[in-house]
Amino acid sequence: MRSPADLARIFTTNVGFYRPLVTTSFAIDRALWNLDARGYALTNVTLLLGNAGLLFLLARVVSLSREGALFAAAVWAFNFHGINMALLWTSGRTALLLCLFAQAAALVVLSGRRWAPVLAGVLALAAMLSKEEAVLLPPLLVVLQLLSRRQSDARAILGNSWPLCAALLIYLLARGQSGAFTLVNAPEYYRPTFNLAAVLKNIGEYLDRGATFATVASIAAWLAARQGMTLTADERRTIRIGITWFVAMYAITIFVPVRSSLYAVAPSIGSALVAGAVASRAWRTAPARFARVASTMIVVIALLLPVYRSRNHGLVEPADLATQSLATIRTAVHDRPDARAVVLIDDPQAPVRLEDAFGALLPDAIHLFVNPGVRATLADAATPGSTDAETLLFHRRGGRLVPVMPDSQSLSR
């Protein structure tokens, strides 16, 4: 991105999905870090910490204790599902930005300030420009206001919702002119399905991914509280808000045939709020017992770090293969400046294949990381006569990509 015109094109170019703020964030990363993956990872970690902080503030705004709010933020951040993908996958940036803008919008509307409706509309639009699930944010924010006001004026709340409606309209118009996916022309695995069996399976899967960890934490906090002590009005209201958030943020994705744990990142904010309300009750009625339970949970999470790490192998192994492969190709092309093409021969029996590492983006990866003048082809076997003096051949050996000499002898490095 070198000019304002490039920025404008981000909002008008069809790349399938319509997530221009995510693309803009990557452009900023490119300007700061060039192609150093560690910089992109640092941005994702920063967004995760920012989201945890916003969840703490949101829990405080709905009147939870500091301890309950901190408990909610921890439950969300240490969920087994989704958070790891949001950090490790490039595409995970979408979920992190959605959560960031959605929570900021919720904080603003619940503040009750005079300027809140307009700012909430801007933040809701930013969330929509980050991920499609946010189209339900305008009605969700209206419902949250109705649930949170002790003496709510429904007419005033509905009257002040026009900036949210305007944000949705602007988003739909901008998306429509970009040519992005619609319900009609999206790939089949992204088109909504109303097959009852498929929807019920999705509901079960997403209840697990978005609520299991929060449920376990809630049970532990409930048992820590003094028995017979009821929830306060604020705690009950927070539970209603959390359930509403959870349902709204899943309302679209349960109808999408393809499942992804990334879809659980935003809804699990709601289940974390429920856990925070239960924890607030425990702290209020039995602070010493709650402190022991919370300390035990911290120790358990620390002991489970190897489990968290092992669950990420399937996410990082393709990235490791891509990094090693590009480094090998870059070295070989540097040694052969006359090379104009590379052919990569994959191992069909390998648990992680080059296709897993690059997908359809191998030419783009070679263009960015190696040389824009070099063509790239991925194959399962070399075709006799398919290479020439300007083509470099590579194949897999021992799980790694290695160059092949013209006499078929591998280079040893």
Name each region found by the language model:
Residues 1-413:
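Polytopic membrane enzymes that build or remodel cell-surface glycoconjugates and lipids
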